[in-house]
C-alpha cells in the first residue's frame, strides 16, 4: 500500500475528526464548515455501521494520524501484544514513541508529515541516554527510550518552517512526558506516555477487537 499523498483535509472529513494532518493555523471546524459531510459522491450513508466497519475505521484513523502503513501497523500490533500490560495502550505508546511523532510533539514540525520530512532529510539528531554525542539520523520510525535527547542540527536552526512550528506548539502545548527547550532547539524524551496522556478521541479497544478475530 502506497503512502497517501492526496488532500489531507479529505482524510479528516472521512474520519469525522481532526487527524492533525494540517498545521492547525486554521481550526478544523472552520475548514470543514462548508463540507461537514464525509467526502464522496453520496455523502453520509443511512445504513448503520457494522461492528466490523467501526473497528476497521478506527484502525484506519490511527494509521492516518501517525502516518503508518498497513504492514508496519500490523507489526506494531504484534509487538504491543507481546508486551506486558494492555495491548491497545502499548500500541499507542509505541506510536507516540516514534521519532517523527516526538519531533512533532516537541514542536519542531507543524505536522507529523513535516516532522517525518525533517528526520528523512537528516535535520534531526539523537543522543541516546547515557551517550555523550549526538548522531544525525534519517529513520522516522526509530523508537525512543527514556532519557533520549533530540536536537535540530545547527545549520537548520534558522529554517522558517521550524520557527513557525514552534510558534504553533506554544499554542498547542507540550506533553508532560517531554522536556523541551525551544531556545536550544532540543528536548528530552522523559518516558513513554501513559494512556491518560494520549488522545482521548482514539478508541484503541476497537483495534484490539479487530485483530483478535
From Swiss-Prot:
GO molecular function, a single term: rRNA binding
Span list, region Disordered: 16-53
S4 RNA-binding domain location: 97-163
SMART domains registered for this protein in UniProt: Ribosomal_S4, S4
Domain of life: Bacteria
Recorded family membership: Belongs to the universal ribosomal protein uS4 family.
Annotated PANTHER family: 30S 40S RIBOSOMAL PROTEIN (PTHR11831), SMALL RIBOSOMAL SUBUNIT PROTEIN US4M (PTHR11831:SF4)
Oligomer and partners: Part of the 30S ribosomal subunit. Contacts protein S5. The interaction surface between S4 and S5 is involved in control of translational fidelity.
Protein name in the entry: Small ribosomal subunit protein uS4
UniProt source species: Psychrobacter arcticus (strain DSM 17307 / VKM B-2377 / 273-4)
Gene field: rpsD
